[in-house]
Amino acid sequence: MSGFFITATDTEVGKTVVAGALAGVFRELGYNIGVYKALQSGHVASNPEGDAARLKVLSGVPIKEDEICPYSIEEPLAPRLAMKRAGRAVTLKDIIHHYNERLKEFNSLFVEGAGGLAVPYTEDALVIDFAKELQLPLIVVARPTLGTVNHTVLTIAYAKAHGLTVAGVILSGCKECEMERVQENKVMIEELSGVPVLGLLPFFEGEFTKEEVLESAKEYIMISKLEEFIRNESTVAHTSSN
């Protein structure tokens, strides 16, 4: 298996934009990349304001929103609680099944979690349990300013304690007027965590187009570094199958 698991230090940090943009860029480069978000709360999958719809638009994948996100609920709560209140039982086995179904169509998947790694996800698992099952390298999306060093370093430490590989950090929502502090935070995160910050994605104000987001990803994220992970994972998978 190859791809990335996109997590974050919190909710509303920019995971969906990062996941969709990276998938879109890699698809432009010729990779057969898909996107997957197992559980979504706050919007049903078909809602154009929801994460599944945004992932579809940004990535350009030729599948339906409910194939990107098989389990969605309107109420904006942690997925486990939202599903429980709706009387729906979703297990870790269920979401892994749908993940494997998507792998029949794509060589690699960029998987978006929900909130951070310790979020209650299915009725029997946290987000980190799902990440451990997939064993994909993590991309941690974080805020660029005050508080981000602590949140990001703790997230990385938690992931490493559970045996996960962290490919890098992307600081999302960077404003030009804050860049001096953002750069200082970048350096501090790298020093304290030992993980590279692979991008400083700008703040998108108001409505934005797919083209704007993908061009920003190409300009501000180290795509070549992430491409090395994809190639290495593919090589390992090919070697293991022989």
From Swiss-Prot:
Family: Belongs to the dethiobiotin synthetase family.
Primary location recorded for the protein, binned into one broad class: cytoplasm
NCBIfam families hit by this protein: bioD
Residue numbers binding substrate: S41
Domain of life: Bacteria
Cell compartments where the protein resides: Cytoplasm
Enzyme Commission number(s) from the entry: 6.3.3.3
Functional summary from the UniProt entry: Catalyzes a mechanistically unusual reaction, the ATP-dependent insertion of CO2 between the N7 and N8 nitrogen atoms of 7,8-diaminopelargonic acid (DAPA, also called 7,8-diammoniononanoate) to form a ureido ring.
Entry cofactors: Mg(2+)
InterPro entries per record: DTB_synth_BioD, P-loop_NTPase
Quaternary context: Homodimer.
Pathway membership, UniProt: Cofactor biosynthesis; biotin biosynthesis; biotin from 7,8-diaminononanoate: step 1/2
Reaction equations catalysed: (7R,8S)-7,8-diammoniononanoate + CO2 + ATP = (4R,5S)-dethiobiotin + ADP + phosphate + 3 H(+)
GO CC list: cytosol
Binding site for Mg(2+): T16, D51, E112
GO biological process per UniProt: biotin biosynthetic process
GO molecular function: ATP binding; dethiobiotin synthase activity; magnesium ion binding
This protein's UniProt keywords: ATP-binding, Biotin biosynthesis, Cytoplasm, Ligase, Magnesium, Metal-binding, Nucleotide-binding
HAMAP family linked: BioD
Active site: K37
Gene behind the chain: bioD
Enzyme's top EC category: ligase
Protein name (Swiss-Prot/TrEMBL): ATP-dependent dethiobiotin synthetase BioD
Binding-site list for ATP: E12, V13, G14, K15, T16, V17, D51, E112, G113, A114, G115
